[in-house]
């Protein structure tokens, strides 16, 4: 069942699509997971990088209550449910929730699906979630701090939020034309970028780290995973060999 919650206020701010809307060729990494065919037995944090079986950021998940922020097409949630977790998914897009439900049905697992803004988590009691996970979704948020505060409220003390985001260095570059990638924006430029139907809000690593700290998370892991070359995904570009495409962060809820 999909539970409907009130959506949050609309996002504001300018949008630029410079360097991110490819007329043809690879899918922009910032659009991940888009319609990519992903496994349903392991969590994938981004295109062409090691997955949870290598990174081991979540720990044992069987019997755990895990919040997934952003449904994607359901692969992350189904992978966790297949491992025995009770998975709660929040997303503001009906089509993504329906895709997650269809994938769960096809794999004979259950998901608890909620429609609403990622910061509207009042339906979850405080200190009841064992882990939270977001794959390339928090980069689409204008107000990251608000979401992190709400996630911190519902996590048990010591429990982790693991998230992946488009790496800010990769968002500086445009590789849509032949030849070397071009730098099209400063590293610290916060202007939103249009990527397909989404908007990406670039943040430096320092800004992400500070947002976690303000929400009472202790960051214990920051990863810039190297790309893997064995089976390139639809997101693959040579630029991924020059700068990291995905940033992965884990923060644990500190005690009061």
Residue ranges and their predicted role:
Residues 65-120:
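Class I SAM-dependent methyltransferase SAM/SAH-binding core
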Residues 198-222:
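Short alpha-helix
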Residues 215-217, 234-256:
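Core SAM-dependent methyltransferase catalytic element
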Residues 1-62, 75-79, 103-107, 160-191:
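Conserved class I S-adenosyl-L-methionine
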Residues 145-160:
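A short glycine-rich, Lys/Arg-flanked "PGG" loop and its adjoining helix->strand segment in the class I
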Residues 119-132:
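A short acidic, Gly/Pro-enriched loop at the edge of an enzyme's catalytic core
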Residues 130-145:
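A short SAM/SAH-binding and catalytic strip from SAM-dependent methyltransferases
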């Amino acid at each position: 069942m999909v539970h409907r919650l009130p959506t949050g206020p609309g996002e504001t701010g300018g949008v630029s699509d410079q360097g991110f809307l490819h007329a043809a060729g690879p899918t922009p990494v910032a659009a991940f997971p888009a319609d990519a065919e992903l496994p349903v037995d392991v969590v994938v944090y981004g295109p062409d990088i090691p997955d949870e079986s290598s990174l081991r950021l979540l720990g044992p998940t069987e019997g755990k209550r895990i919040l997934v922020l952003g449904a994607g097409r359901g692969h992350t949630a189904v992978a966790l449910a297949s491992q025995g977790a009770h998975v709660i998914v929040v997303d503001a897009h009906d089509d993504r929730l329906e895709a997650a439900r269809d994938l769960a049905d096809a794999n004979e697992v259950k998901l608890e699906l909620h429609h609403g803004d990622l910061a509207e988590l009042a339906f979850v009691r405080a200190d009841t979630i064992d882990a939270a996970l977001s794959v390339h979704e928090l980069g689409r948020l204008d107000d990251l701090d608000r979401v992190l505060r709400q996630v911190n409220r519902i996590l048990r003390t010591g429990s982790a939020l693991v998230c992946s985001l488009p790496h800010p260095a990769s968002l500086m570059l445009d590789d849509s034309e032949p030849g070397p990638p071009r730098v099209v924006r400063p590293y610290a430029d916060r202007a939103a970028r249009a990527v397909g139907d989404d908007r990406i809000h670039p943040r430096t690593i320092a800004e992400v780290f500070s947002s976690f700290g303000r929400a009472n998370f202790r960051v214990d892991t920051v990863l810039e995973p190297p790309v893997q070359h064995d089976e390139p995904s639809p997101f693959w570009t040579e630029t991924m060999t020059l700068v990291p495409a995905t940033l992965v962060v884990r923060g644990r809820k500190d005690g009061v």
